[in-house]
Design a protein with these regions (language model features):
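Hydrophobic alpha-helical connector segments
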Residues: 39, 52-81, 133-137
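Residues within the helices of the helix-turn-helix
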Residues: 13, 24, 34
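Amphipathic alpha-helical packing segments from all-alpha helical-bundle domains
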Residues: 83, 94-123, 131-138
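Short amphipathic alpha-helical segment with a characteristic S/N-K-E followed by hydrophobic residues
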Residues: 32-37, 48
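Short, amphipathic alpha-helix enriched in basic
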Residues: 1-14
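Short, basic, alpha-helical segments at the C-terminal edge of helix-turn-helix-like DNA-binding modules
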Residues: 41-50
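C-terminal peripheral helix-coil segments that are non-catalytic and often amphipathic
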Residues: 73, 109, 113-121, 140, ...
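Short hydrophobic/aromatic patch on the recognition helix
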Residues: 20-30
Length: 180
């Protein structure tokens, strides 16, 4: 994980040597280099999402929007993640966005958990089932932050506007109060 956080290329042979293990053991534990990187990326994202939630003000949809916006800005500004996506684009997109991988399902679980917590606290009424909303929020983030197809990669302001609309949160740009 430290190698990833320093921005270095993740080489299974080097990691195995650092841990005093054989490369085969590392592959047995994780299955593949991509799964190993997925574990590292998911684990690195968890404290960032918790920090974004801790810094968000208010409750309900507004707190969710601020949390997601803070997390998205962390991802967009993260030099190490950007370097990884630029250096290994195809592998990075598979690792980050695959439903069969580690990162995407873990992010959906964490985002859905935040939504459920606001619902259970009586602070938010979700427009759809929380797991569906969590999935949509994560996919939106992936599209706006990592997919260059529409020329909007890294556009966190536009991402915030779309998330606000989906969450039913009023923003100064939208100017009207949406149902919570």
């Amino acid at each position: 994980m430290h190698r990833y956080l320093r921005g270095g290329r993740i080489d299974v042979q080097e990691i195995a040597a650092e841990l005093g293990l054989g490369r085969t053991t590392v592959y047995r534990w994780f299955g593949s280099r991509e799964k190993l990187i997925g574990q590292v990326v998911a684990r690195a994202g968890e404290p960032a999402l918790r920090a974004a939630r801790a810094q968000a003000r208010g409750t309900g949809g507004q707190a969710l929007l601020e949390t997601f916006d803070g997390f998205n800005r962390f991802l967009a500004d993260n030099r190490v993640l950007r370097t990884f996506v630029e250096r290994e684009r195809d592998a990075a997109l598979r690792i980050i966005t695959s439903g069969a991988g580690t990162v995407h399902p873990r992010m959906v679980e964490m985002i859905s958990g935040l939504i459920v917590a606001e619902i259970e606290a009586g602070n938010y009424v979700a427009p759809v089932e929380p797991d569906t909303l969590g999935y949509a929020i994560v996919r939106l983030g992936e599209a706006f932050l990592f997919n260059d197809t529409a020329g909007m990669r890294g556009d966190v302001d536009r991402l915030r506007d779309v998330e606000a609309a989906i969450l039913g949160v009023s923003t100064p740009e939208r100017g009207r109060e949406a149902p919570r």
